[in-house]
Amino acid sequence: MELKLNRKYKDTLFRKVFNNKKDLLSLYNALNNTEHMDESLITINTIEGAIYIGYKNDISFIINSELNLYEHQSSVNPNMPVRGLIYFAELYKGYIDQNNLLIYNERLVKLPFPRYVVFYNGTEDEPEEQELRLSDSFEKVLEGEVQRTDIVEAEANKPSVEVAVQLLNINYGCNQELLEKCQKLMEYSRFIALVRVKSDMLTEKYKKEMKSVNKKEIFADAVALAIDEAIRDNVLKDILSKNMAEVTDMLLTEFDEKAYIEGVKKQSYEEGEAKLAKLVVELKKRGRVEDIAKVTDESERERLYKEFNI
């Protein structure tokens, strides 16, 4: 089964909420415990229309010699630092070109300090804050493979490139102090929580009524109810009242993407199970019982896959 997803980019609700400098500055202040009031300090440099690794970042901007990359994600992906590396490279290239910086000159080129923050509001339990690092993706140099005797293992495993991602859980009830510092972030968190409450309520309602309604239809109904209630309660009222259809479309697109990702994971798991079963059969045929116990180790499993051309 081949799974497909329309990769044409659409704005996320998070980006819609923070696409103006006033609210973006409020979010920056909340994160950094600053009190900047001058919106002109912000230079937004999001690479418009650029999709990298199948995703587009939500917002990037420069303020006070800091290059900030903000993303919203509904799932925790350990490859976020890899995507960040690629996107930061593009941002710095643009900055160097725009400012006519001479990187081959003998004078040191000054660049804005990078900060990468991901705002998580998925349904899985995650800590309020965690850090993901690019170096976790790098293959480590084993002690026996260190060729130069003057380099200890710790130094050999010190990467020349690093990207650190600050991952913040903004589900309603998490990081309360941060949410209270930024009104729009609080409202965004409340609205997403409201959509989920309505979705659970409708799922239970249709189940009791024995109605056959698919998940996407339930979600669409939940979004409509959540928007109405949010407007009444003055939650993202300015955005929801003016852009009701657009917001609905954004959330349904995010729903489709989540369903796609879950489908890919399920397919990958099933394919992996079939591959593993084939390997075990081959090992049994050859009487290599001792190797069957080794398949729980990823590196050994991959070695055996290569050996049997699976």
Residue ranges and their predicted role:
Residues 1-310:
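Elongated, amphipathic alpha-helical interaction scaffolds
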